[in-house]
Amino acid sequence: MTNIRKTNPLLKIINSSFVDLPAPSSLSSWWNFGSLLGVCLGVQILTGLFLAIHYTSDTATAFNSVTHICRDVNYGWLLRYLHANGASMFFICLYLHVGRGLYYGSYTYSETWNIGILLLFAVMATAFMGYVLP
């Protein structure tokens, strides 16, 4: 008796895409962190842009603009929450992504590894200049 997911034309498409995916057997949940980094970065950029629309950098009114965002802007509190916690999630995913590369020996591909290290240093420098120094 054949399996219905392999004989039905509609289920066959879904089966070949999701169930019997042609992927290596060494794929594990550790390999999701690259795409999670992309999602976190996208959320950071979008929430940062929307927060920057309402933020005032003048020293006399900066705190008032933050309270304005939280109280008067629709879901402004959520934007601020997502932006603050998204940065932490981004760095957690980044360090786990590098840790996965160390565990699986990706450092042997020196060109790719060196580009990744340069990106890591650039992200850390940007976070330091943008969030720690001001």
UniProtKB/Swiss-Prot annotation:
It is found in: Mitochondrion inner membrane. Binds 2 heme b groups non-covalently. GO terms for cellular component: mitochondrial inner membrane. CDD domains: Cytochrome_b_N (cd00284). Its cofactor is heme b. It is a multi-pass membrane protein. InterPro entries: Cyt_b/b6_N, Cytb/b6-like_sf, Cytochrome_b_N_euk/bac, Di-haem_cyt_TM. Its main location: mitochondrion. The chain crosses the membrane at residues 33-53, 77-98, 113-133. One of its GO terms (biological process) is mitochondrial electron transport, ubiquinol to cytochrome c. GO terms for molecular function: metal ion binding; ubiquinol-cytochrome-c reductase activity. Keywords: Electron transport, Heme, Iron, Membrane, Metal-binding, Mitochondrion, Mitochondrion inner membrane, Respiratory chain, Transmembrane, Transmembrane helix, Transport, Ubiquinone. Heme b b562 binds at residue 83. Coiled coil: none annotated. Heme b b566 binds at residue 97. Heme 1 (or BL or b562) is low-potential and absorbs at about 562 nm, and heme 2 (or BH or b566) is high-potential and absorbs at about 566 nm. Belongs to the cytochrome b family. The cytochrome bc1 complex contains 11 subunits: 3 respiratory subunits (MT-CYB, CYC1 and UQCRFS1), 2 core proteins (UQCRC1 and UQCRC2) and 6 low-molecular weight proteins (UQCRH/QCR6, UQCRB/QCR7, UQCRQ/QCR8, UQCR10/QCR9, UQCR11/QCR10 and a cleavage product of UQCRFS1). This cytochrome bc1 complex then forms a dimer. Component of the ubiquinol-cytochrome c reductase complex (complex III or cytochrome b-c1 complex) that is part of the mitochondrial respiratory chain. The b-c1 complex mediates electron transfer from ubiquinol to cytochrome c. Contributes to the generation of a proton gradient across the mitochondrial membrane that is then used for ATP synthesis. This is Cytochrome b. The lineage of its organism: Eukaryota, Metazoa, Chordata, Craniata, Vertebrata.
